[in-house]
Structure formats: structure tokens, C-alpha cells
From Swiss-Prot:
Residues 23-87 form the LCN-type CS-alpha/beta domain. The keyword Cell inner membrane does not apply. Disulfide bonds join C38-C61, C47-C66, C51-C68. Pfam families: Toxin_3. The heterodimer LVP1 induces lipolysis in rat adipocytes. Induction of lipolysis by LVP1 appears to be mediated through the beta-2 adrenergic receptor pathway (ADRB2). Expressed by the venom gland. This is Lipolysis-activating peptide 1-alpha chain. GO terms for cellular component: extracellular region. GO terms for molecular function: sodium channel inhibitor activity; toxin activity.
Length: 91
């Protein structure tokens, strides 16, 4: 009985998108102040490149917008992330 309850709760939590680890992410914002749009849901190369521009290693398309896992609030805006990770820039 306990195993069935555990499995049911695990599936329920995964379907609702809740994270038990607390490792959340954010939607990155481009230089024009917009979220990056994407057409192919799930993992795709475009969102992965966008997330790398914002300083994180993992991202995917969620509700037709790129979502980056572990993206900190300070790196959501493109130019803020650019200043943080591109030390040789003059912006």
C-alpha cells in the first residue's frame, strides 16, 4: 500500500511541475525586453544556445518560450548576463 501511495504522489508531483529540490529556473529576456520565442517544444538547440548566452547549461522550450533551468534573477536580462560573463566588453 505504501509503495502505491508513494508512486501515485511521485507521478502527481511530476505532472504538476513541482520541484522538490528547489532548483528553479527562469525565462530569459532578450535585448529588447521580450522573452525568447520558440516553436519546437522540449529540448532544442535554439533554447540551449539562449540559455548558454545567459550563463546556464540547460534549457528547453516550455509554453513556446525558452526556459532556462537554474537561471538566477540577476542573469534574466541579456545585458546583465553579458556584463557578468563577458569581462572584456565595454558596455
Amino acid at each position: 500500500m505504501n509503495i502505491k501511495l508513494f508512486c501515485f504522489l511521485s507521478i502527481l508531483i511530476s505532472l504538476t511541475g513541482l520541484s522538490l529540490s528547489g532548483d528553479d529556473g527562469n525565462y530569459p529576456i532578450d535585448a529588447n525586453g521580450n522573452r525568447y520565442s520558440c516553436g519546437k517544444l522540449g529540448e532544442n538547440e535554439f533554447c540551449l544556445k539562449v540559455c548558454k548566452l545567459h550563463g546556464v547549461k540547460r534549457g528547453y522550450c516550455y509554453f513556446f518560450k525558452c526556459y532556462c533551468e537554474l537561471l538566477k534573477d540577476k542573469d534574466i536580462q541579456f545585458f546583465d548576463a553579458y556584463k557578468t560573463y563577458c569581462k572584456n566588453s565595454r558596455i
